């Protein structure tokens, strides 16, 4: 049972066949998609507004051929480092596949597949779905044809969701329990870290000892829900632009420009320039980002040539990110990578309300030399 009183929460549960009771001043639910509080209170989850319904299969593998040894004729030039040393995301029809090599050898790999594009295999086992994907994509099969699964592959029947409610008077869910979008850009990490940071700033011993609702919970929950919504909008737009790839690549720059600006501003001690994740706490910047995402989706649906669509999308992204593009991103670039170059930070110091000297000092402070 779950009983909320004015000054505490009482939990009743069974552990190892024994009935136990726990009294807590407050509860922070960090249990992920199987939210314990949601199960206790019967809180329902809802589908996402923008990201298509999807499912996932995944596992850990040994004897995976590195991507550098696979066919790379689609690339214009040699990559700057072995691709398999990064978290590699392969876009496929109706989804994407990840491949993440650990330092000691094994590879974490899996696929996110939309219900609409893969309805015919959704009810199959994880292993059958995985083999189907490999058969459909020879370059992936080339990497995994000798691979051995370390443990039975697993399957998530429904990936994206958001809870109808994420807080009560004395309990709150971390963003990881309140909702999940898609691991495409690993946005779950900053969403949850933001939630932890806000809770850490708001909760004090005297706050927990007092009676009645914890006043900070509604505001924290509202901010987390807003960030979940903009992530959903972003990922949904990326799914809509996966084909052709250059539309997708250009659209990702909305994300990379925003988060690199935020990271730099925060390291400069100027958090007010980029409050929240993806400008979630700045209504003007947030609205600009959302408007760009809407326009991109509209263009993607137009009955025009891919070249015309790409030019329109690139123009929107270029103008949208101009005020916060401090790392030299170019939506019209034909190569799929940008160097780890600090010089754009100096050129764009004014966008960060800073001087080149302040940029230099910040880089030295964090162990980066230029």
Language-model features: where?
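Short, surface-exposed, charge-dense and proline/glycine-enriched linear segments
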Residues: 21-33, 77-88, 170-180, 234-251, ...
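Glycine-centered secondary-structure boundary/capping sites
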Residues: 42-43, 144-145, 367
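FAD/FMN-dependent oxidoreductases across multiple families
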Residues: 93-97, 116-236
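Residue-level signal for alpha-helical context at structural boundaries
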Residues: 45-46, 55, 75, 148, ...
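A general structural signal for short secondary-structure boundary/capping elements
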Residues: 73-78, 144-145, 156-158, 219, ...
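C-terminal helical "tail/cap" subdomain of flavin- and related membrane-associated enzymes
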Residues: 201-370
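Alpha-helix boundary/capping detector
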Residues: 63-64, 159, 246-250
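Predominantly flavin-linked oxidoreductase catalytic cores and closely associated redox partners
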Residues: 1-139, 196
